[in-house]
Structure formats: C-alpha cells, structure tokens
Amino acid sequence: MRKYAKYLPFCLVVPFLAACSSKSTTSAKGKKIKSPFNYLSKDTNGLDILTGQFSHNIDDIWGSNELLVASKKDYVKYTDKYYTRSHISFEDGLITIETLGNQNHLRNSIIHTLLMGADPRGIDLFNSGDTPISKKPFLARQVKDQFGRDIINVAIANDFASHLLQRQLKTRRLQNGRTVTYVTIKMVADHVEVRARKYLPLVRKMAKRYGIETSLIFGIMEVESSFNPYAVSYANAIGLMQVVPRTAGRDIFVRKGMSGQPDRAYLHEPANNIDAGTLYLAILRNEYLDGINDPVSKRYAIISAYNSGAGAVLKVFDADRTSAFNRINQLSSDAVYRVLATAHPSKQARNYLNKVSKARQKYINIR
C-alpha cells in the first residue's frame, strides 16, 4: 500500500542525514580513541531548514497530497530535481517508478533502482541525484525480467526497462493537473526469504556471539523492517533491526566500552545493525529480564520488551520488579504469552508479540 503524507515528519527525515564529522570517544579505561561512531547533530535549526526545503520541493512539484516518504518497510528516492521517484514496498513486494518528466527519465530511474547496492550509506535521500549502480545489486534475485533473468547488469536492466516502457506504461493525473507516467514491477513471490538469506551468515555469526536463537533474530528483522537495509521509522529507529541510537544504542555502547551513542551511518551498515540488535536482545535476556526462569516465557518477554521496553513488560505483571518476576515465574509460558498479548497497555506491543512469534517459526529450520 502506498503511503502519503501532506507534511514530511521531521523524525522521518532526520535519520537519513549523513554524519560526516569524526570524533573521539572514551573507552571504559578512560583512554581517548578514534571512534567510527559519530554523535547526533545538535544543529536542529539546520535540520529544520533542510527538512523544510525538501518538503517544499516535493509539495511544489507533486502537490501537497503527494508527498511519499520512506519508512521501515518502504524505500523512496527522488531524482531529476524531484520530478522522478522510485518507491519499493518491501512488505508488499512492489516497485513503483514514476515521473513527471519524459520516458528517458523513467528509463534511467528504472535502471538505477534495479541496480542499486545494499549499502544505504551511499544513498542520499535528500538530493535528487541518481542512486549509484552497484556490481552487486541489492534487488538481484528479487526481481526477474520478462525472460525470467536476474537483473544484475546495465544491459539486462536497460532491456527490461524497454519492455516495461513498451508494454506496461501507465499514466495518472495529479490534483495539481500534472500527468504522472509510471510503471510497476512485481517482485518474486519469495522476495522476503530471498532478502533474509542475504543476511544468514551475519545472523548466524551474531547468534553464536551472543547466544541468541537465529530464528528469533530473523523473526524480529522481518517484523521490524521486512529486511529493508534502508529502513528508518518515525521514532528514529534505524536499519534492519530498527535500533534507536538514544536508547538501545546507548545501552549497546556501554557494553562495548564506548561513550555516547552510535550514529546513523554506523547503524545503517547491516553487520553493525545486526550486531547491535542482537546484543540488545542479549542485554534484555541477561540483565533486564534475568529474573524470568522459564526460557520460553523469557523469550516472549524479550520479544515484547524489544518493542516496548523491559520496564513496560514487567509492569504488565506488577509495578514492583521483584513481584513481577515472581508472578511471571508462577505462570506457564502459555499464560505469560496470553497476558502479554492481551493485557499490555500498548496495542502495538500486543500485536508485535504475535507477529514476531509467527515470523520466528518460518526461520527455525533455515539453512
């Protein structure tokens, strides 16, 4: 489903800002070291200006009801001075590429979108330049051309673009009177699994490092981002496992002997993001929820806490931490699940436990 908003929320835009400055951080021993992490910018006035300019550009060209924005499971990139845009719904498995310009602009956007790489750090969603072409396209095996071929180079992508422009070109009228020319591309039926398998080596590595179930990591990744490495949310959660720098990020830094919090570029790197998300699961298990005895009950609590926080989970059972643990340990794992799925004050958290538990089942035997 396409997602439109009249105004682009500041918190949706900010996570895509590039953090280029280099800073020093302090290790647990007090030694100054060169850090690969940057701190969140304090120049909110500058960010407000950039956000306003970006929003104004889109409103002025497409109309106030046509501002399509990126989200956890949606990639959106504007090009050609904002007259062309590509939208990938990783949840629905649908790619829409549209332009207010001519077919050459549409062709170019098709090619660059299909051949873009997997590293979000090389993509600036604020400027209207083309996405760099990669020798290892992220969408490879997720999209097939008219002959069933994987789209892995410019020649195949250009041939497929010609096919789309000749056979599947459509138009629609905007409220401002302009005409949009567009094409839609369906991803393969198992596109979610194809993306998941891209991260199998990393997930196995982090699962072993922190003693977390592979299936749990995959289940959370699917629900959080549908394996969209470009993912960002309204809460400034970033990447595949939707890590929030100022909360989970700070906890993770403490355990790594670092000060501050990770920057967006760091968390957009898949290996870093999966490491951070999995470490946070281990923190929940070993520290915040360590008083739960039954491993299945603890898993349910961990899942719910990943979404709403450990404190909120314990308060479902009792306002007192010790009493909450005692109450949980008196219940069967099925009963713990029912309580969290029905009595948690957050509807999102209630649904989250159900979604992750179901998604996790699909990855128990992944090879």
Curated annotation (Swiss-Prot):
Where is this gene product found? Cell outer membrane
The record's section on Pfam families has: Mltc_N, SLT
- Where a lipid (N-palmitoyl cysteine) is covalently attached, the residues are 20
Q: Which UniProt keywords apply?
A: Cell outer membrane, Cell wall biogenesis/degradation, Lipoprotein, Lyase, Membrane, Palmitate, Signal
**GO biological process terms on file:** cell wall macromolecule catabolic process; cell wall organization; peptidoglycan metabolic process
**Where does the secretion signal sit in this chain?**
1-19
Q: Gene Ontology cellular component?
A: cell outer membrane
Family matches, as InterPro entries: Lysozyme-like_dom_sf, Murein_transglycosylaseC, Murein_transglycosylaseC_N, Transglyc_AS, Transglycosylase_SLT_dom_1
Give the residues carrying a lipid (S-diacylglycerol cysteine). Answer: 20
Q: Which reaction does it catalyse?
A: Exolytic cleavage of the (1->4)-beta-glycosidic linkage between N-acetylmuramic acid (MurNAc) and N-acetylglucosamine (GlcNAc) residues in peptidoglycan, from either the reducing or the non-reducing ends of the peptidoglycan chains, with concomitant formation of a 1,6-anhydrobond in the MurNAc residue
Top-level class of the enzyme under EC nomenclature: lyase
Entry's CDD domains?
A: LT_MltC_MltE (cd16893)
Q: EC no.?
A: 4.2.2.n1
Q: Which GO terms describe its molecular function?
A: hydrolase activity, acting on glycosyl bonds; peptidoglycan lytic transglycosylase activity
Q: How does it sit in the membrane?
A: Lipid-anchor
Where is this protein chiefly located? membrane
Q: What does this protein do?
A: Murein-degrading enzyme. May play a role in recycling of muropeptides during cell elongation and/or cell division.
Regarding protein family, the annotation reads: Belongs to the transglycosylase Slt family.
Protein's name according to its UniProt entry: Membrane-bound lytic murein transglycosylase C
